[in-house]
Amino acid sequence: MGGGLVKKNLVLSVSIFAVVLLFSINSSYAARETIRITCWEGYADAAMVKQFKSLVKKKYKIVVDVKASYPKDQDEFYKAAKDGTADLISPPADVAKTPRFYCFQEGNFLLAEVDLKNIPNAKNLIPFFAADKSLTHQEKRYGLPYNCGPYGLDYNTAIVKEAPKSWNIFWDPQYKGKYTINNNFPKCNIWITALALGYKYDQIFDIEKLDRAKIQEKLNVLAQNAKSLWDGSANPDEFPQLALATDWGFAAAQANKKGGKWLIAAPKEGGTAWIDYWCITQAAKGTKKKLCEEWINLQLSPKAQAAVVKNQGVSPVVNNVGKLVTATEKNLFHVGDNAYFETVAIWQVMSEKTEKAFGEMWEEAKKLRQK
């Protein structure tokens, strides 16, 4: 009897070991997926990635790895889509239809149509953004808005006591050497220079409607008197030394987290604004594409859109964030304010001639910084 008991215990032990071993093997071979994201820095932060991984594991029983890369220029979004090195990209709205970046060549679409059934949070888009056709082609949608912000006029309230009323403050001699402006989006500086000269929204996106020589003269001064030029995003560590800055909103938000007192002005001439989209490239197929749609849906959730305000210093695109932000944030970043977005000039696709001219004008202006 004793020997039988030992045998039974031995069999039981072996069985338990086998079950544990089998479970371990199955766990090690659990479904895995990698999502490659090319996006502006901050759009795939650690908190968002952690939340996404948890969601995917719970909903799909998939262990997902997120590999993010951060471009400095918009051409990197096009290259990532063209080369298939990213599954998700976050380009400005006008990129996909800009001639040199065109993503809808017959027989060679670089982007995948999004399935709105998998992105239920899209129903909360503010009407202005829901109606935007930037990423619509042949009545099909190839992306969804994520956030919106200005090429804004930021001012340091510790130095500039009253809110600037005009873009012309950049040409005020007292601020020579005390401001920073963008370098790698030449069009933005031509736009604000044109607005400062009195041109209207329906003129600034077309070189044929502008006096090139007149704008060049003023642009030269803007470039020459800047303390610095920034690529990608302005450097918040430089902000304590500055009185003024152009900014997407990100740098001012970061500077304020470090004790800065920066605000965004509302120039009387108006201003331009970008919309960044989430787009899925043709590289994402099957389950990978569905996981990309889950990412977009998560990014349109109230919590993620509130983070757009608090972490990025720009505007959310949905209408259900109001309770998650302060009254000051709601006012400053026009949270849920559809009427406001109707008043700004959203970046438009420009002709190759205009793009080329603006690039040449900026390079000419920068030459004066070297003298």
Model segments located where?
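Early extracytoplasmic/lumenal segment of secretory-pathway proteins
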Residues: A31-C103
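Short beta-strand->loop
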Residues: L110-K123, G143, G260-T272, Q282-A284
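Periplasmic-binding protein-like
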Residues: K178-C188, D211-L222, K258-Q282, L298-G322
